[in-house]
Each structure stands twice: as C-alpha cells, then as structure tokens.
Amino acid sequence: MPLLEVEGVRRSFGGLVAVDRVAFKVAAGQIKAVIGPNGAGKTTLFNIISGLLKPDAGRITFKERSITGFSPHQIARAGLSRTFQNPSLFVQMNVLENVMVGRHHRTRCGFARCALRFPGQMTEERAIRAAALQHLAFAGLAHLAEFPSGALAFGQRRMVELARALATEPELLLLDEPASGLNTKEKMDLGNLIRRIRDRGTTILLVEHDMSLVMDLSDDILVLNSGVPIAEGPPRVVQSDPKVISVYLGGDLKEDASGGELSAKWIQTP
C-alpha cells in the first residue's frame, strides 16, 4: 500500500479551477516531485494535502487512513510535516528555540505548557531541547543554535525551517520550493540533506522549479499543467514525454532551469 494516496482531488476559487482530478500515489521511502509551470496548482495541492485548504472533491489517504478535511494540527500529529516557499520563523526566538517549537508536536506538554516550566515538565523540556539539538546537528546547523533567528541569512532560514519540520519526526515531509532563493552551493547542500533525510526513512514529496535538482533527486515525478496531471513517471520518462515538452517548450523559452523555467538543456539531460 502507498504511504500517501491522492484520489480525484479538485479545488476551485470562484470560477477558477486550481486543481482538477489530481490523483497520484507516494510509496514509502520515495522522493517524489511535483512540477509544472507557474500557476499549475502545485502549491494549492500541497495546501490541500497539509490541511490548509479543504478540497471541493476527492480523497486523501495517509497510512491507509483518510485525512481529507483534517486540520493542519491533526495532519502533523498523524506524521506529515511541511515547509513553505517563504520560511516563517519566530524572529524573537533563537535558532534552537524555533526547532524546539517543532519538537513540541511530539510531546505531552505542548509548547505553551512547557514554556511555563512547571516542575513536572522540566524533564520533558530537557528532552525536547536535546532532540532539537540533534536535528540541528543533522542539518549542519549546530553552530547556529543560539543565534537570533531574525539575523539569519535567507538560505540559513530555509535550513532552520527544514530542521524544525524534521523535529516533528514526520513519516512524510512536504517541501514547497526548498531551493528557491538559494545559491549553487546551498542547493548542493540541500540536495545532500534531502538524500540523507530519505536514507534515514522519511518519505519526501517536493514542489520545485530547479529542474537539475528535481532530476537528480527524484524517484518519480508528477507534472501538472493548469491544475491537471499531464504526465507521471521516473525522470527519464517524464523528460521525453511529448505533453511535458509541449508545455515547457511550446513557446520560445530561453531561461535556464534554475531560473524557474524548463529549458531544452533539461530535456536533453542524459
């Protein structure tokens, strides 16, 4: 059985259909990418899966249990976590405290009660801190633990948000354009981290415009266009699909893939 199954999901905003009849599966241990031009419905799909939006129709199953219409908190509790296009950290907290917030989803006391530091909860708070430090170290951020979040560079904020998502110990991690705004070295580091996350047992579903990264990381790719799936399969199959080539190369696209547009260079990637 797949870890995640999306069946016939549809969502509209007024007269605009954002996603329509979207169906796909994500196997446990897989890195699956969702790609498509701007406005294809990728982030809307992520928002539906993670509970920020409710679908007009369709069903979402996670670990053989329907999570359709669940709140974001319920979905996080079920074992699914996500990051966003624009990192959203608590700027009044340091890096470690931000990651500890994510870890509180896996505790009995929760963030607010632990923050009150009642005697019976101090032991759990120490365990939360230790676990958060481990996730920072895994992401290569241990040296920034006490650093103010508001003073971080953009790429560092992205990595802290990823560490915070990992602190929830998800079985499925959704990454929404994780490479956006990163330089070449940061993208390389991100790719290595995503592989390590998968290698330790976390399944990954990502939306990304950097096609070099997508082709390098993904086991399977779903392509959306105007909210509708047009292709699905391994990278080599998707690269050569006539519908995908038509969508991305139908006009006179000259930009490099790292700029958010697919190019002939990508289509010809060996």
Task: Annotate each language-model stretch with its function.
Residues 1-270:
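Glycine-rich phosphate-binding loops of nucleotide-dependent enzymes
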